[in-house]
């Protein structure tokens, strides 16, 4: 099991500097993580640092609130891909889900999936804000719109990934769709717990410490 290939090595805080992106990319090269996950403004720079490697640049769309319109999310997706993004993690319209406006939730996801084309799309449902019924519905809609993954959390809300949520998401989408656990995954033990629950990708800012088997003290 190549644990590094499960990990999106992440730096999404608003105060992230160019130097921190350079460090993130260097660590990703050294440890051969699946991707670095950075905000859209950092995609082009991260891509330039990872030329000639297998490490993808992942970015986030409508992040962290998910409250942009479908058209804005689609534009953001296309712009990020033009800059070199190889994967996109979008946040759903959480309020629309709460309102049971499932057509809008679906339209929003489809806008990004269509804009992304062959680029992997992950759909962040922000589990901490949802009931179990809403989590299931969000996963069903994401799957129906052709997304590649469902993802637990932004890491910027009231809670992160739990093994219970990952297991529920896996049960909902079946064996073939990706499930990404993110938010509060800080140790080797955390990662293994999430993988055992059904996760096929991990979002973490503590990727190096995880691989070293260390408990990290980061925020997300």
Swiss-Prot record:
GO annotation, cellular component aspect: cytoplasm
Cell location: Cytoplasm
BP term (GO), one: deoxyribonucleotide catabolic process
Domain of life, source organism: Bacteria
UniProt cross-references to SUPFAM superfamilies, sorted A to Z: Aldolase
Catalytic activity: 2-deoxy-D-ribose 5-phosphate = D-glyceraldehyde 3-phosphate + acetaldehyde
First-tier enzyme category under EC: lyase
EC number: 4.1.2.4
Function noted in UniProt: Catalyzes a reversible aldol reaction between acetaldehyde and D-glyceraldehyde 3-phosphate to generate 2-deoxy-D-ribose 5-phosphate.
Protein's recorded name: Deoxyribose-phosphate aldolase
Organism (species): Macrococcus caseolyticus (strain JCSC5402) (Macrococcoides caseolyticum)
